[in-house]
């Protein structure tokens, strides 16, 4: 009944947030290279009259890139978004959005001054009604068109440098599938030539911040289309799972009774159509995915290549990964050793942190294990398990941030693969976000994880941790000081005892006010560090 009721909202609710703003997907905006739409609240570009923001030229990072992409001027995603726009809204204070009409993550209220912290929960801890509501929200997103965003169906060159716009409407769920595809697609070099060693969302430092921003935008989109401001994406804790416990009709869809590669007809996910899964066809045609339906979701969990991924990740592998102190290292790609990012992403062995691209660990392991739509990078977001999986991966990233408390400078400023330097703007988001802006605690972005919350002691422990670390560093000195203090105390005690023995024969006028036994019974002692 709840699912039916949600279906009725399809003709009522409208979404927002994604890739190309509809109001900027026209010849005039493309030729002017400007995307500074008016805010509805006052009718001025970027809400300038209300002091929300101004239309400004985009300042691009000039930091050098790594050697992985040896071309320049051949891909629309280079120096994002300058091929399409060189002027966008720069929002002030806590305002955000392509027209500064929204609040930054973690803020709410008319003037975006109210802090708000939401909690992402384990999907198996949701009540039946909460779980059904989540599934209904996903189905709603799959069936309602985006009001504010469209997708590009051609390159800038194919658009004749903006004079012939090529954009298309898309539903809210598939908008995010397309964005994931667009960020990870190959570079089209002309003819039948492509460059595959490029990815703006994977295999480099931006993997974790990019997906963090991606989920936050997806989460906010669902909040908007449902009117449920408290909605958060649940996570699936897959550590030590023996099989795909989430793959049931009660949750994300069971297995088809006669075709193990399909979903059970009892799950409405079985009727979903996938997009952006035929990368070789796009490459041969030198075309972009245009969001045409390409068939049902494929999933055959556990029937993958066991030599590459023998099982789902374990708790011990996650714990080892969290001990790694370097966020990034070496070449800062899938060949990086002792890199927390590369180990969590799954290109390095989860027991040694040495790169091994013949195996798939941690994050990658789950994608391979699903053995279907989720196992191909560009189209993996078609399977709704993607959301649950990446929410848990993000929670591991959050654990590492809280444990090691890195400075922003730990995130590489230069020489990372294209699009992954700290100040690079993330492809393909408009409004613009830099990689470094999401290399911070989730609490600063307005959300937490149920299993990471520390109810009473959290804030106090956060306050103490830096001082405890300093104490740990000077511990040898503290021990030495304690030993010396003990010696001095012993010497002084001996001298005092000797003096007291001498005083036993003194006159009453100079006797102590308390006897030794009274001293012992009535004086309280405190120890100090």
UniProtKB/Swiss-Prot annotation:
Cofactors, names only: Cu(2+)
Q: Where does the UniProt entry say this protein principally localizes?
A: membrane
> Where are the annotated glycans?
86, 111, 161, 230, 290, 337, 356, 371
Alphabetic keyword roster = Copper, Glycoprotein, Melanin biosynthesis, Membrane, Metal-binding, Monooxygenase, Oxidoreductase, Signal, Transmembrane, Transmembrane helix
Question: What molecular function does GO assign, one term?
Answer: tyrosinase activity
Q: Sorted alphabetically, which PROSITE patterns does this protein's record hold?
A: TYROSINASE_1, TYROSINASE_2
Places the protein is found? Melanosome membrane; Melanosome
Q: Which GO terms describe its cellular component?
A: melanosome; melanosome membrane
The entry sums up its family as follows: Belongs to the tyrosinase family.
Q: Does the keyword Cell membrane feature in the UniProt annotation?
A: no
Q: Where does Cu cation B bind?
A: 363, 367, 390
The name this protein carries in UniProt is: Tyrosinase
Q: Give the way it sits in the membrane.
A: Single-pass type I membrane protein
The residues that hold Cu cation A are 180, 202, 211
- Which superkingdom does the taxonomy of this entry point to? Eukaryota
Q: Catalyzes what? A: 2 L-dopa + O2 = 2 L-dopaquinone + 2 H2O; L-tyrosine + O2 = L-dopaquinone + H2O
| Broad enzyme group | oxidoreductase
Q: Which residues lie on this side of the membrane: Lumenal, melanosome?
A: 19-476
Per the entry, the cofactor note is: Binds 2 copper ions per subunit.
EC assignment: 1.14.18.1
The gene is TYR
**Which terms under GO biological process does the entry name?**
melanin biosynthetic process; pigmentation; response to blue light
Matching InterPro entries: Di-copper_centre_dom_sf, LE_dom, Tyrosinase/Hemocyanin, Tyrosinase_Cu-bd
Organism name: Gallus gallus
Quick one: signal sequence residues? 1-18
**UniProt-annotated stretches for the region Disordered:** 293-313
Topological domain (Cytoplasmic) residues are 498-529
Q: Where are the bilayer-spanning segments?
A: 477-497
């Amino acid at each position: 009944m709840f699912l039916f009721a949600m279906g009725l909202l399809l003709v009522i609710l409208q979404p927002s947030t994604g890739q190309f703003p509809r109001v900027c997907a026209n010849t005039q905006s493309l030729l002017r290279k400007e995307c500074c739409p008016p805010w509805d609240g006052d009718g001025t570009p970027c809400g300038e009259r209300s002091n929300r923001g101004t239309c400004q030229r985009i300042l691009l990072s000039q930091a050098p890139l790594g050697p992985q992409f040896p071309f320049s001027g051949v891909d629309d995603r280079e120096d994002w978004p300058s091929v399409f726009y060189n002027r966008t809204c720069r929002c002030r204070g806590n305002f955000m959005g392509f027209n500064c009409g929204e609040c930054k993550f973690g803020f709410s209220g008319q003037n975006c001054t109210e802090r708000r912290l939401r909690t992402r929960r384990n999907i198996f801890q949701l009540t039946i009604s909460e779980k059904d509501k989540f599934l209904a929200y996903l189905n709603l997103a799959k069936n309602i068109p985006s009001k504010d965003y469209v997708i590009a169906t051609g390159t800038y060159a194919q658009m004749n440098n903006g004079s012939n716009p090529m954009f298309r409407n898309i539903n809210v769920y598939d908008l995010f599938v397309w964005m994931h595809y667009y960020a990870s697609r190959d570079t089209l070099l002309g003819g039948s030539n492509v460059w595959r060693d490029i990815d703006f969302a994977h295999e480099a430092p931006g993997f974790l911040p990019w997906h963090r921003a991606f989920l936050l935008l997806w989460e906010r989109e669902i909040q908007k289309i449902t009117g449920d401001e408290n909605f958060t994406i649940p996570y699936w804790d897959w550590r030590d799972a023996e099989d795909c416990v989430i793959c049931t009709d009660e949750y994300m869809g069971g297995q088809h009774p006669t075709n193990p590669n399909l979903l059970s007809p009892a799950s409405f996910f079985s009727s979903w159509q996938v997009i952006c899964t035929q990368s070789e066809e796009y490459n041969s045609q030198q075309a972009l995915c245009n969001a045409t339906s390409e068939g049902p979701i494929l999933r055959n969990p556990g029937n993958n290549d066991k030599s590459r991924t023998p099982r789902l990740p374990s708790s011990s592998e996650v714990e080892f990964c969290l001990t790694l102190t370097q966020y990034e290292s070496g070449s800062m790609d899938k060949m990086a050793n002792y890199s927390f990012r590369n180990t969590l992403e799954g290109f390095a062995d989860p027991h040694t942190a040495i790169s091994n691209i013949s195996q798939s660990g941690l994050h990658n392991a789950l994608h391979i294990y699903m053995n279907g739509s989720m196992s191909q990078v560009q189209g993996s977001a078609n399977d709704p398990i993607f959301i649950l999986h990446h929410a848990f991966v993000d929670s591991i990233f959050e654990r590492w941030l809280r444990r090691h408390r890195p400075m922003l400078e730990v995130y590489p400023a230069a020489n990372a693969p294209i699009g992954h330097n700290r100040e690079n703007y993330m492809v393909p988001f408009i409004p613009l976000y830099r990689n470094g802006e999401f290399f911070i605690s989730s609490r600063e972005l307005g959300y937490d994880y149920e299993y990471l919350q520390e109810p009473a002691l959290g804030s106090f422990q956060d306050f103490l941790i830096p001082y405890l670390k300093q104490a740990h560093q000077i511990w040898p000195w503290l021990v030495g000081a304690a030993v010396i203090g003990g010696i001095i105390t012993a010497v002084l005690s001996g001298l005092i005892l000797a003096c007291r023995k001498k005083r036993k024969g003194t006159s009453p006028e100079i006797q102590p006010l308390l006897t030794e036994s009274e001293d012992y019974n009535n004086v309280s002692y405190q120890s100090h560090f």
